[in-house]
From Swiss-Prot:
Name recorded for this polypeptide: ATP synthase subunit a
Gene responsible for this protein: atpB
Keyword list, A-Z: ATP synthesis, Cell inner membrane, Cell membrane, CF(0), Hydrogen ion transport, Ion transport, Membrane, Transmembrane, Transmembrane helix, Transport
Record-linked CDD domains: ATP-synt_Fo_a_6
UniProt lineage: Bacteria, Pseudomonadati, Pseudomonadota, Alphaproteobacteria, Rickettsiales
Summary of subunit composition and partner proteins: F-type ATPases have 2 components, CF(1) - the catalytic core - and CF(0) - the membrane proton channel. CF(1) has five subunits: alpha(3), beta(3), gamma(1), delta(1), epsilon(1). CF(0) has three main subunits: a(1), b(2) and c(9-12). The alpha and beta chains form an alternating ring which encloses part of the gamma chain. CF(1) is attached to CF(0) by a central stalk formed by the gamma and epsilon chains, while a peripheral stalk is formed by the delta and b chains.
Membrane topology summary: Multi-pass membrane protein
Cell inner membrane is among the record's keywords: yes
Compartments where located: Cell inner membrane
Source species, domain of life: Bacteria
Chain segments annotated as transmembrane: 29-49, 84-104, 114-134, 140-160, 181-201, 203-223
GO CC list: plasma membrane; proton-transporting ATP synthase complex
Example of a GO MF term: proton-transporting ATP synthase activity, rotational mechanism
Family: Belongs to the ATPase A chain family.
The keyword Lipid metabolism is assigned to this record: no
Length: 242
């Protein structure tokens, strides 16, 4: 029987847990998010626990990732953004490892579920809002009224800017979840046809499949980068009011 391409996204309970009337069961999504966190911690521990003047390849790769995030913050926020390196770096690494872990056979892609990506997006949204009010007080509300806006146009602009601001976590989460789900569905569908196509095209479908997998790995890395760079831009709006 041919399985549905969407079956790979099914949430399955591993340990049934009820707490205060809420279902907080440990699922396959939970275990893969936990596994992604453990793999990330292990990777950076092995890369930095014995740092050398002449770095190993593992240390070089870890430093490249760190510098990538540091540059994102520096280019978008400036020196003031350095204090947010732990937050943004953790966000990028968690999403990256969840995305890449989902590329392994018979695994689960936690970031293909909107509840996971929306939680991350809401976290960014709340931090940005709190930082904005803590740093600027009520002046943060001027974010919704660009400087130089005509008075008669102000009510409309405020509504549009407020709606755009509130829509940030929705667009941020949907973009990541939709791209990860679409890519995996495409791979599943094409993989299902590969065996049949090999009867007529011999081994031609195999390199095509390899290319598609390589492209999906690129998308997994790119989506982690896009989520993070947008988070940096939102932080910049809160720190450096325009």
């Amino acid at each position: 029987m041919t399985h549905s391409p969407l079956a790979q996204f099914d949430i399955k309970k591993l340990i049934d847990i009820k707490m205060f009337g809420f279902d907080v069961s440990f699922t396959n999504s939970s275990i893969y998010m936990l596994l992604a966190s453990i793999l990330a911690l292990t990777y950076f521990y092995l890369a930095f626990y014995n740092r050398k003047l002449v770095p190993s390849r593992l240390q070089v790769s870890a430093e490249i990732v760190y510098n990538l995030v540091a540059d994102m913050l520096n280019q978008n926020i400036g020196v003031k953004g350095r204090k947010f390196i732990p937050l943004v770096f953790s966000l990028f690494i968690f999403i990256l490892f969840c995305n890449l872990l989902g590329m392994t056979p018979y695994s689960f892609t936690a970031t293909s579920h909107i509840i996971v990506t929306f939680t991350l997006a809401i976290l960014v949204f709340l931090i940005v809002t709190i930082v904005g009010f803590v740093k600027h007080g009520l002046r943060f509300l001027t974010l919704f009224l660009p400087h130089g806006t005509p008075l008669w146009l102000a009510p409309l602009i405020i509504v549009i800017e407020l709606f755009t601001y509130l829509a940030r976590p929705v667009s941020l989460s949907l973009r990541l979840a939709a791209n990860m789900m679409a890519g995996h569905v495409l791979l599943k569908v094409i993989a299902g046809f590969t065996v049949s196509l090999m009867i007529y095209l011999k081994f031609l479908p195999i390199p095509i499949m390899v290319i598609l997998i390589g492209f999906e790995i690129f998308v997994a890395i790119l989506q982690a980068y896009i989520f993070t760079i947008l988070s940096c831009m939102y932080l910049n709006d809160a720190i450096n009011l325009h």
